[in-house]
Amino acid sequence: MFQIDINCDLGESFGAYKIGLDEEILDYVTSANIACGFHAGDPSVMRKTVALAAEKGVKIGAHPGLFDLQGFGRRQIAITPEEAYDLTLYQIGALSGFLKAEGVEMQHVKPHGALYNMAAVNPGLSEAIAQAVCHFDPGLILFGLSGSELIKAGDRIGLRTASEVFADRTYQEDGTLTPRSEPDALIQDDKKAVGQVIQMVKDSTVTSRKGQAVSLKADTVCIHGDGAHALTFAKTIKKELKAADIQISALSKD
């Protein structure tokens, strides 16, 4: 039977600003990537999101990003590998405190936004991020774009890696995501998104913007929790994957 983990970026509210429907989305995912205060989130939101995920039995991962609240961590900022190591380790450590207080374990680490995309193509940054994860806990799973430099770096260092695919994003011919600045970067149609996920899981391919079949590996699929139709999207994805005989379950650290 085909199997997939469903993950979502959560805990991205901060201060007076509320982003996403975290409590509702948690009913439809198996892994939660919780913001650690740099691109979004704050200590109170981190604590509450950890507690919610733990209550619902959803696996928890750190979601470190660039220090860019105004740009939501989606703007590329030039950083050195040393800086990538430091900011990754710092944010994992911050979330870890709340997990320890709640009595639950961290499952994975998934970089956010621009940091994720930069690490996907930059060997130096990807190596630094993988090192930070490994030095914190070599038992953690490193999430990264399927076929990316980040996955390669994690594999080289001996980490368990999870190749990630996206339900609501279009792909380019080289297997990277279409930049959000492009008009067709996001998939708004639920049926098209579901069809893309089923293809990625069952056929290990995705159809690029130009109609080319691109090979990939799908261990976990990301759905975004900050969109206007995020909750409907989450419900539909889970329902249709089950109907397609795809088992939905969290990854194992073993």
Curated annotation (Swiss-Prot):
Keywords on this record? Answer: ATP-binding, Hydrolase, Nucleotide-binding
Q: What InterPro entries does this protein map onto?
A: Glyco_hydro/deAcase_b/a-brl (IPR011330), LamB/YcsF/PxpA-like (IPR005501)
MF terms per GO, please? Answer: 5-oxoprolinase (ATP-hydrolyzing) activity; ATP binding
Q: Which domain of life is it from?
A: Bacteria
Set out the biological process GO terms recorded for this chain's protein. Answer: carbohydrate metabolic process
Q: Which reaction does it catalyse?
A: 5-oxo-L-proline + ATP + 2 H2O = L-glutamate + ADP + phosphate + H(+)
SUPFAM superfamilies reported for this sequence:
Glycoside hydrolase/deacetylase
Keyword Nucleotide-binding appears in the UniProt entry:
yes
Enzyme nomenclature, EC number: 3.5.2.9
Q: Does the keyword Amino-acid biosynthesis apply?
A: no
Q: What does this protein do?
A: Catalyzes the cleavage of 5-oxoproline to form L-glutamate coupled to the hydrolysis of ATP to ADP and inorganic phosphate.
Sequence similarity? Belongs to the LamB/PxpA family.
How does it associate, per the subunit comment?
Answer: Forms a complex composed of PxpA, PxpB and PxpC.
Q: What is this protein called?
A: 5-oxoprolinase subunit A
